[in-house]
């Protein structure tokens, strides 16, 4: 239980004790509410004016019990309040409140489960692309260190396998989730939980063992990745064709921020049009890499490729070109 939660609990207990004692004094002593309430407050504060004292046996007995319980509750609460300020919880509390306010405003964001080596790289890439994201990790110290370096990060301390934690990250409004915690079993469980809470969310999950890849897909992951396989394949490509790989990397890492994106054709004006007559290249400047029709993907589509509503277009270009393409194929002015 967090310190501020202990303070809230202590205050609630104190208020309940005061109200209960007030009712008892009204009942056994016959006092009006204000007199009973006043006496209860004075007693628990240990001021002890002595202007009102119970005369009945039950009244005196209730005050004895009340004093022990009340003084204990006050001491507990004051101790936590002191700890709240002395141990730096005050700053942490308001940082948490501010962060939760930012999370409430999130929409169409990504959730990164696990802030280890992979999680940090993913977060850096998202920051470069100005993509909103939330980090979930159970290591509080790790996230505090990350926030010291970058106060703009949005982090949640907790177990990503917990539905409550995923709900805190607004999973119902999230666009995607990336599960890169250290345990394959946890990645499978996170995938299952995420799909249950948001069936439409796009999930990429990490597998330490190649044998886990199929399990992640069956659990609901849209993509399952084994870093060792991907890393090994990349190293092999670099060794075999260093010039080609370097060229591809230079394209992606240019100052113009070249990217590859996918869009669904929604513009009715493009329905049943040939690619060469669509005006995509002329109006946007983006290059079409592939067109996906149902389960069939046409790579390097020829000019006579027919475009239909619902087709998925994979395109390459600058951010500005791709934004123009997005507006054009989706029919947004």
UniProtKB/Swiss-Prot annotation:
Residue intervals annotated with topology Cytoplasmic: 1-6, 82-333
Span of domain RCK C-terminal: 246-331
Domain RCK N-terminal: 107-229
Protein origin, superkingdom: Archaea
Membrane topology: Multi-pass membrane protein
Keyword Metal-binding: no
Matching InterPro entries: 2pore_dom_K_chnl, K_chnl_dom, NAD(P)-bd_dom_sf, RCK_C, RCK_C_sf, RCK_N, Trk_Ktr_HKT_K-transport
All ranges on the Extracellular side of the membrane: 28-60
Note from the entry: Inhibited by barium and cesium.
Quaternary structure and partners: Homotetramer.
Known role: Potassium channel protein. Seems to conduct potassium at low membrane potentials.
UniProt protein name: Potassium channel protein 1
Origin species: Methanocaldococcus jannaschii (strain ATCC 43067 / DSM 2661 / JAL-1 / JCM 10045 / NBRC 100440) (Methanococcus jannaschii)
Lineage: Archaea, Methanobacteriati, Methanobacteriota, Methanomada group, Methanococci
